[in-house]
């Protein structure tokens, strides 16, 4: 006779074992109709699953985050159902959920086209609208394998052979004639799966291994209702307009080409933004008392073996050989900074030492994962490493946190998600070391009044980390900043300092990055601003233009005055109508356009317009130079007249 405890503390007693759905029905028909699954003693379970012992139960509906994920997972199965009807020879691999949707990897002897996607989506909707029940059956391992062998599904058989114990009882989900295998839970009925959209097809290696066969990955999105789907598709349209690859080409910021995959060719305007970011971060390094260093981009394999990178990171490292020695191009800067620390005797009085570098790093990311500036193989980190005592951990992490928020606020990012990533399965160091490291970061977050999410097993192999994820104007999350605590690497590389008792101690090392990859951060802010960079970052801050040839000398004079004041200004003396010039430079997202006609020359002034179309009136040259200098110095986000 199980007693079921509900979220409000009330209890219901049943004479016999009872399913999640039956509990919902006992509460009310409306709740039963809305029930997708349940959370039994904190564990997600299917609506048909039986509860035979006293338990706590939360009903999961489409309004819950878990409910939406279950809908998406069930839509992946619905995709399998539909594609099997249209392409009976297709082999199904895996179909998990992802942010905002799902995908399914399939093996088909022809490339899927947009027309195929449209047909699959149409069949999915036809099937879903029949509102058929999804039937779950627990079977033996052998029965599951026999089922998929009979159905000609080699990838499902491989999953059973390699990932599931022979004593297990896998769950098979029956969608009418289609059968899939999954941990679940799934929706009880397809009435929950009416609002979806198939988006694209991409290549994906089976098990993510390039030695395996390339499969076709079908991506889709799914939502609880029509309104949510429409809003998401609208956000996607806006994201496409803001795509940094599209804007980067339109504004001539950079390009990438096949001969250098994942590596950036910076053009003048893009490199201007890059250097401005470096300059800005350097001012903060000085403010927070860092020293700037520069390490070599390549070091002997022996050093990387000592750090543990060779054993844990080799697949992502580029290597080369010379004079019978093997070298690795650095994927990160930390080992080089320890070498700098090791030069000369250090005392506890010298600590903390805060060492920063704009380090050029390379990682051999899979070609299929490369994406504009967001995922590259060569990148520059605004990296720093702090060498300190254990007693200094909390104060130093606090200083890093303040620096993170200080810098992000300059770019207008205020919605920042904080995550604490704990020890991964593949790691160096003992549990006692990891306990101290994780506790140190957690204490610093608590001391700074920050709420955070724990990401179990997501830390680096050498230490736990705090991650700072920016939420942008389209409600997307970008992980940028990190603060990592490392008790292991300094000891592996023989770093030490003389303690107060004259004994030798190993310093604690704090890894810190704020922008993360400068390349990626430029991609993020390009999309955040839609290319309308704030004045201090804009490659060209002002364009001075004439109306007729008679104003050419005056235009040059104004341009020189702006340039002499450190403002990035250009003149436009082309024989075009001024309206044409204004439109062109507006499309180029230039913050200010200065028009010089006969009236302006006579008054010794300039007429100023913004890229947003605002007419700011006339200013003397000196007035506008001073105003613009102050705006750039303040690194404000808004143009004149927008305050």
From Swiss-Prot:
Gene Ontology CC entries for this record: cytosol
Record: residues binding Zn(2+): 334, 385, 511
EC number: 6.1.1.3
CDD domains found in the cross-reference section: TGS_ThrRS, ThrRS_anticodon, ThrRS_core
Catalytic function, reaction form: tRNA(Thr) + L-threonine + ATP = L-threonyl-tRNA(Thr) + AMP + diphosphate + H(+)
Single GO MF descriptor: metal ion binding
Enzyme class, broadest EC rank: ligase
Stretches for region Catalytic: 243-534
Keyword terms of this UniProt record: Aminoacyl-tRNA synthetase, ATP-binding, Cytoplasm, Ligase, Metal-binding, Nucleotide-binding, Protein biosynthesis, RNA-binding, tRNA-binding, Zinc
Cystine connections: none
Annotated SMART domains: tRNA_SAD
General function of this protein: Catalyzes the attachment of threonine to tRNA(Thr) in a two-step reaction: L-threonine is first activated by ATP to form Thr-AMP and then transferred to the acceptor end of tRNA(Thr). Also edits incorrectly charged L-seryl-tRNA(Thr).
UniProt xrefs under NCBIfam families: thrS
Name of protein: Threonine--tRNA ligase
Organism in which the protein naturally occurs: Actinobacillus pleuropneumoniae serotype 3 (strain JL03)
């Amino acid at each position: 006779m199980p007693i079921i405890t509900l979220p409000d503390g009330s209890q219901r007693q049943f004479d016999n074992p009872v399913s999640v759905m039956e509990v919902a029905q006992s509460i009310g028909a409306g709740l039963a109709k809305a029930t997708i699954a349940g959370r039994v003693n904190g564990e997600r379970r299917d609506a048909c699953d039986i509860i035979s012992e006293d338990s706590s139960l939360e009903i999961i509906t489409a309004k819950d985050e878990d409910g939406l994920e279950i809908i998406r997972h069930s839509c992946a199965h619905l995709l399998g159902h539909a594609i099997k009807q249209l392409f009976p020879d297709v082999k199904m691999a895996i179909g998990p959920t992802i942010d905002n949707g799902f995908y399914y990897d399939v093996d088909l002897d022809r490339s899927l086209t947009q027309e195929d996607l449209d047909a699959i989506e149409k069949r999915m909707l036809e099937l879903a609208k029949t509102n058929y029940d999804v039937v779950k059956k627990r079977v033996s391992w052998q029965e599951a394998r026999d089922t998929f062998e009979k159905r000609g599904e080699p990838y499902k058989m491989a999953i059973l052979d390699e990932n599931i114990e022979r004593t297990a009882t896998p769950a098979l989900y029956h969608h009418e004639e289609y059968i899939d295998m999954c941990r679940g839970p799934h929706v009880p009925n397809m009435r929950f799966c009416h609002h979806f959209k198939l988006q694209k097809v991409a290549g994906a290696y089976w098990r993510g291994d390039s030695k395996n066969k390339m499969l076709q990955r079908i991506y889709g999105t799914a939502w609880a209702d029509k309104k949510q789907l429409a809003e998401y598709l609208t956000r996607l349209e806006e994201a496409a307009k803001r795509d940094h690859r599209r804007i980067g080409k339109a504004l001539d910021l950079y390009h990438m080409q096949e001969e250098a995959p994942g590596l950036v060719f910076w053009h003048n305007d893009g490199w201007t933004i890059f250097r401005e970011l470096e300059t800005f971060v350097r001012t903060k390094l000085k403010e927070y008392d860092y020293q700037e260093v520069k390490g070599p981009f390549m070091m002997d394999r022996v050093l990387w073996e000592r750090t543990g990178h060779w054993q844990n990171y080799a697949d992502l490292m580029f290597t080369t050989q010379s004079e019978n020695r093997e070298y690795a191009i650095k994927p990160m800067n930390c080992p080089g900074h320890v070498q700098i620390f090791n030069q000369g005797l250090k005392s506890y009085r010298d600590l903390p030492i805060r060492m920063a570098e704009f380090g050029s790093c390379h990682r051999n990311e899979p070609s299929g994962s490369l994406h504009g500036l967001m995922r590259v193989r060569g990148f520059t980190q605004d990296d720093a490493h702090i060498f300190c005592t254990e007693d200094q951990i909390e104060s130093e992490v606090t200083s890093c946190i303040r620096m993170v928020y200080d810098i992000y606020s300059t770019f207008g990012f205020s919605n920042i998600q904080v995550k604490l990533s704990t020890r991964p399965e593949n790691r160096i160091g003992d549990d006692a070391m990891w306990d101290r490291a994780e506790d140190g970061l957690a204490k610093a977050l608590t001391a700074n009044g920050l709420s955070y999410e724990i990401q179990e097993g997501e830390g680096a192999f050498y230490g736990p980390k705090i991650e700072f994820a920016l939420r942008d104007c389209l409600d997307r999350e970008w992980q940028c900043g990190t603060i990592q605590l490392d008790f292991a690497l300094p000891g592996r590389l023989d770093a030490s300092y003389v303690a107060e008792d004259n004994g030798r101690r190993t310093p604690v090392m704090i890894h810190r990055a704020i922008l993360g990859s400068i390349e990626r951060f430029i991609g993020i802010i390009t999309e955040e601003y839609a290319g309308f960079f704030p004045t201090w970052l804009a490659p060209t801050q002002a364009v001075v233009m004439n109306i007729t040839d008679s104003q050419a000398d005056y235009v040059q004079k104004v341009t020189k005055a702006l340039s002499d004041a450190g403002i990035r200004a250009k003149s436009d003396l082309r024989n075009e109508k001024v309206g044409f010039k204004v439109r062109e430079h507006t499309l180029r997202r230039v913050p200010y356009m200065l028009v010089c006609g006969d009236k302006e020359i006579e008054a010794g002034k300039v007429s100023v317009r913004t890229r947003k179309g605002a007419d700011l009136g006339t200013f003397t040259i000196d007035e506008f130079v001073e105003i613009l200098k102050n705006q750039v110095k303040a690194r404000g986000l808004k143009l004149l007249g927008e305050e």
